[in-house]
C-alpha cells in the first residue's frame, strides 16, 4: 500500500515513482491512492490497484458539523507533513487559485487559510481546532487534479464530517452521491 499520490507535476513525483518501481520484481500487487489509469510506469498495469485513503475512526472521529462556525471556507497549504513549516522561497501553484478565489469572492466569503499570507501550517489538534470553525473545506493536492489522486488530507476533511470541495477532474464523484461532496 502506497499512500502518497503519484502525479506528474507533484514535486515528489519522480521520487514516489522510483520508490514504487524499486522492487517491482518482488511485489505481486500494488495498492496506491492514484488511479492506475494515469500512471506511466514499468510496473505491469494489472499489478496496480486503486485504494482510497482510509478514514480511521480512531483518528478521524470529529463531528465537526456540530460545532459553531466562524468561517465559510477552510484551506490548508503545506509543503508536506515532513516539513512542519513552509520552506523559504517555495512556490506552490495552489496559491494562485486561492488568491483568485478570494479576489472573486468580493468579501462575501469568510476564508480561513493556513500556509499562506504569513500563516504557517498547523498540525494535529491545532489543525483540527481551525478546521472545525469552517462550514466547508477545499481539498487541493499538489501537482494539479488527476484521477483519484489526493493527499491524505481528504480523509481528515471527510472523516471529521466537513463538507469538502474537490476538483471535479479528480473524479471523486465516482464514489460519492450528489450533496456528499462538492
Where are these regions (language model features)?
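Nucleotide-sugar donor-binding catalytic core of glycosyltransferases
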Residues: 9-178
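Short acidic-hydrophobic, aromatic-tinged amphipathic segments that line or gate anion-handling sites
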Residues: 181-182
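Active-site proximal beta-strand in glycosyltransferases
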Residues: 1-7
Amino acid at each position: 500500500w502506497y499512500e502518497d499520490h503519484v502525479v506528474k507535476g507533484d514535486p515528489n513525483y519522480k521520487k514516489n515513482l522510483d520508490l514504487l518501481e524499486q522492487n517491482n520484481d518482488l511485489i505481486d500487487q500494488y495498492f496506491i491512492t492514484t488511479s492506475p489509469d494515469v500512471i506511466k510506469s514499468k510496473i505491469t498495469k494489472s499489478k496496480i490497484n486503486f485504494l482510497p485513503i482510509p478514514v480511521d475512526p480512531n483518528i478521524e472521529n470529529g463531528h465537526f458539523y456540530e460545532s459553531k462556525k466562524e468561517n465559510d471556507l477552510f484551506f490548508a497549504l503545506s509543503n508536506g507533513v515532513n516539513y512542519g513549516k513552509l520552506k523559504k522561497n517555495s512556490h506552490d501553484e495552489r496559491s494562485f487559485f486561492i488568491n483568485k478565489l478570494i479576489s472573486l469572492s468580493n468579501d462575501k466569503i469568510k476564508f480561513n487559510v493556513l500556509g499562506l499570507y504569513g500563516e504557517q501550517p498547523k498540525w494535529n489538534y491545532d489543525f483540527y481546532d481551525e478546521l472545525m470553525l469552517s462550514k466547508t473545506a477545499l481539498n487541493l493536492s499538489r501537482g494539479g487534479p488527476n484521477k483519484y489522486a489526493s493527499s491524505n488530507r481528504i480523509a481528515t476533511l471527510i472523516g471529521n464530517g466537513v463538507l469538502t470541495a474537490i476538483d471535479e477532474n479528480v473524479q471523486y464523484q465516482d464514489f460519492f452521491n450528489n450533496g456528499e461532496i462538492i
